């Protein structure tokens, strides 16, 4: 049976400032930690990326032509405040006014994120969100943007608080490249959630007319053997690290006893302690019912096995299938069932995980109000032939996830939109330019755009709301 989506559904495309804009030092933009980190550690940089800084009229025209009626955009904090605070860069402000005006001209609703992995270097080198001073700087930056850009009706504070802490302090593939420091992971999560809560409260106190929420990456965690209590425990602990800790902060305003017990166990085994203050919980409590929506980024699920050994994580950044490894002392190790497909980057393709995660939110956090799927898509080594890409695998991936999304809506979840990652091909943080996600192929040499087969399929989807 062909499944469908609601008439008022947003069919969106997602981007991010640093991954799309290029122009990393143009018109007064301040540096971010990624600039030097990529030069020192990787075989690529974010220059020129998709040159969205200059090409956004082209991309938004394509969006309109292909039925995309929403776009995720992030503001580069260091375009507005080159050092993260203090003097405003007027050219950065002007750019975003022009960008949002073009969105509305093209009838593509902008969903705007304040922070997408790109803290200004001056603040990042001073501890990023481990430094509580940067909570204040973020709230000041948010306050400026809320006041300056009334044309924005949908705001999100952060993109993927979980993967920021993981990337910076656990896997070590984000600057500053620290590995296996679980205390820093949790402290980063916590301080960013406090920053989120304070920005949301400020937005509501000021009486702005739009909506505000947060985008969380929520990979669903399963026990490898559901009959084995040790595997079940491993999945629970892994879920606390990546999902439950930040969801509790978002919607409970505190950490449940189960969550705190799990965190304390992990830190007892791995070392470290957290700085959790009364004023932090006052901020979380004040904002827990003020979020207008939750953005869910979902790409994959994980299966966990019991593990008794030392932490070791190997990141598959080059698309060499089977080269990744993930095991955490006192938590567990990832091992996927052999019958479940995965990408060349070892990302497990499991649409049911999206359904399960949505229904988990509905059950455990009933004050969620509404959900947007703010990222979902297939990274692939696209083959450019005849001025297009015949990306049937991407179409199949998106179709399967939209079908379970339709099921979740039928089962009572309030899901209002879907943003494919990504609108056009962009640069990937730890994979460079080989891993493509876009509806539109970007020739990174010429910056020409070419619709892929998936773009034509997505247009039909948006026109009919039928998942075919």
UniProtKB/Swiss-Prot annotation:
Pathway where it operates: Carbohydrate metabolism; lactose degradation; D-galactose 6-phosphate and beta-D-glucose from lactose 6-phosphate: step 1/1
Protein family (similarity comment): Belongs to the glycosyl hydrolase 1 family.
EC category: hydrolase
GO biological process: lactose catabolic process via tagatose-6-phosphate
Protein name: 6-phospho-beta-galactosidase
Alphabetical UniProt keywords: Glycosidase, Hydrolase
Record keyword Cell cycle present: no
Highest taxon above the source species: Bacteria
Species in which this protein is naturally found: Streptococcus gordonii (strain Challis / ATCC 35105 / BCRC 15272 / CH1 / DL1 / V288)
Signal peptide boundaries: none
Keyword field contains Hydrolase: yes
GO cellular component, one term: cytosol
InterPro entries noted in UniProt: 6P-beta-galactosidase, Glyco_hydro_1, Glyco_hydro_1_AS, Glyco_hydro_1_N_CS, Glycoside_hydrolase_SF
EC number: 3.2.1.85
Binding positions (D-galactose 6-phosphate): 19, 116, 159-160, 297, 428-429, 435, 437
UniProt-annotated catalytic positions: 160 (proton donor), 375 (nucleophile)
Molecular-function annotations in GO: 6-phospho-beta-galactosidase activity; beta-glucosidase activity
Catalysis: reaction(s): a 6-phospho-beta-D-galactoside + H2O = D-galactose 6-phosphate + an alcohol
